[in-house]
């Protein structure tokens, strides 16, 4: 009996060590899958130079043409800080991040059509890291599109200060949220045409109902409710309150952000809303991905 107990005691540590080694092996495989899929999205982003150029040109056209036109239509304040282009600049940053980040989900749809996704699914890797790597790659690509636009902030009177580094970090979080939404749509949509239609229907309403083009406060009735419920409203307002210079909020009281009664959310609270959106979208996408494929 004593001999048997001694044998069990000596067998337990090797079994525990084997379990720990197995967990480390699974973690290493998951991290490797995340890194490979992240690199894949980044390489795809770097090779498509025409798309990079067009994604930068379109937001700048909105800023210089649409923004300048509305700047002439908005009544000027008494000071010299009233510039609608500076107010519109956070929306332009959001526009630069939005399209490429949400389009990252298209890679999942095309991989499903080409059969590459099936090869990923039979690999000895859990499925959540597959979506996480794609989301991180899409967020990196979206940040790469927004960086040239951010460098042109001086064109609308926004000074180059260290606060722009905080804006860059906020854009990274916003890009990850957009990519998570795009991945969620891609997991639910089985065909490329369906994905493109859904993304096209979602992008513009999300942008225009986020306070990017007009102030989020003081809106009438149902419109104010819809804008307040849009998570991207808080992303735009966080960018607007972080960007340096008075010109960003130079429309006076009309440039106030979203409010819930007498409470105005702080910038960390607004970024928390964006983080919750990203986490929910990625969680639902992972659940659907595990059940549908």
Regions of interest found by a model, annotated:
Residues 22-24, 73-82, 246-265:
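Short helix-coil transition/hinge motifs at the ends and kinks of transmembrane helices
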Residues 66-72, 160, 186-237:
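Transmembrane helix segments
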Residues 59-68, 83-156, 202, 207:
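Hydrophobic alpha-helical transmembrane segments of multi-pass membrane transport proteins
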Residues 3, 32-36, 214-259, 268:
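Short hydrophobic, aromatic-rich alpha-helical segments embedded in or entering the lipid bilayer
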Residues 127-200, 204-206, 266-286:
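Alpha-helical transmembrane segments and their short interhelical loops
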Residues 36-44, 115-122, 190, 200, ...:
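Short amphipathic alpha-helical coupling elements at transmembrane boundaries
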Residues 2-15, 243, 260-293:
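Junction motif at the cytosolic side of a transmembrane helix
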Residues 11-58:
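Aromatic- and glycine-rich beta-strand/loop motifs that create alpha-glucan
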């Amino acid at each position: 009996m004593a001999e048997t107990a001694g044998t069990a005691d000596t067998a337990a540590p090797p079994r525990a060590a084997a379990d720990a080694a197995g967990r480390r092996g699974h973690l290493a495989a998951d991290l490797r899958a995340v890194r490979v899929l992240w690199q894949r999205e980044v390489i795809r982003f770097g090779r498509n130079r025409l798309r990079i150029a067009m994604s930068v040109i379109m937001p700048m056209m909105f800023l210089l043409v649409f923004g300048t036109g509305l700047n002439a239509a908005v009544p000027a304040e008494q000071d010299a800080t009233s510039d609608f282009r500076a107010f519109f600049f956070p929306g332009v940053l959001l526009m630069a991040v939005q399209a490429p980040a949400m389009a990252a989900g298209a890679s999942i749809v095309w991989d499903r059509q080409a059969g590459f996704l099936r090869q990923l699914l039979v690999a000895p890797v859990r499925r959540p890291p597959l979506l996480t790597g794609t989301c991180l790659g899409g967020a990196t690509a979206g940040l790469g599109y927004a960086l040239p636009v951010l460098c042109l902030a001086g064109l609308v009177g926004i000074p180059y200060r260290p606060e722009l580094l905080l804006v860059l970090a906020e854009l990274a979080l916003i890009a990850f949220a957009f990519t998570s939404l795009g991945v969620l749509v891609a997991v639910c949509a089985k065909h490329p045409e369906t994905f493109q239609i859904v993304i096209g229907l979602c992008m513009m309403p999300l942008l225009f109902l986020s306070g990017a083009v007009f102030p989020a406060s003081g809106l009438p009735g149902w419109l104010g409710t819809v804008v307040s419920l849009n998570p991207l409203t808080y992303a735009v307002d966080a960018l607007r309150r972080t960007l340096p210079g008075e010109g960003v909020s130079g429309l006076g009281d009309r440039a106030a952000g979203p409010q819930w009664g007498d409470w105005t959310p702080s910038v960390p609270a607004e970024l928390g809303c964006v983080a919750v959106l990203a986490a929910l979208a990625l969680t639902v996408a992972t659940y659907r991905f595990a059940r549908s494929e």
